UniProtKB/Swiss-Prot annotation:
Gene3D superfamilies: 1.10.287.370. This is Prefoldin subunit alpha. One of its GO terms (cellular component) is prefoldin complex. The keyword Cytoplasm applies. Keywords: Chaperone, Cytoplasm. Molecular chaperone capable of stabilizing a range of proteins. Seems to fulfill an ATP-independent, HSP70-like function in archaeal de novo protein folding. GO terms for molecular function: unfolded protein binding. Heterohexamer of two alpha and four beta subunits. It is found in: Cytoplasm.
Length: 130
């Protein structure tokens, strides 16, 4: 196999690995957002008598949660807004849809890269047979 073809195949493999890592990271975000929606939708927090709030570095403090008052929600670039729990849940559901669209685009890119890899590999294999 010629060096340039081998380099091209290695490059495509690295791109596929990069796309796979991005898909994995986004899937983890989707799971985290789904968990947050479940928590916000559940009355379990209201019924819990003990609430520990992380203050960082593995340290927790006893605290109270008032889910009926506004939640402070990040909307990007270090900007936060106050909104009702129901609005936050809807925002999170929209975020999941956006993340799923991103996953689909990445899957399409991955398919294209795999097709390119197979084309380069098959073309080189055909040349070597002749």
């Amino acid at each position: 196999m010629a060096r340039d073809v081998e380099a091209q195949l290695n490059y495509i493999e690295s791109l596929i690995s990069s796309v796979d890592a991005q898909i994995d990271a986004i899937n983890k975000m989707v799971l985290e957002v789904q968990t947050t929606i479940q928590i916000l939708s559940s009355d379990e927090l209201r019924q819990s008598k003990e609430r520990l709030i992380s203050v960082g570095s593995g340290i927790f403090a006893n605290g109270n949660l008032d889910l009926d008052s506004d939640l402070i929600v990040p909307i990007g670039s270090g900007v936060y807004i106050a909104e009702k729990r129901s609005e936050t849940i809807e925002r999170l559901k929209a975020n999941i849809e956006n993340l799923k669209e991103s996953i689909q685009k990445l899957m399409d890119q991955r398919r294209t890269l795999v097709d390119q890899y197979n084309t380069v590999y098959t073309t080189e294999a055909t040349r070597n047979i002749k």
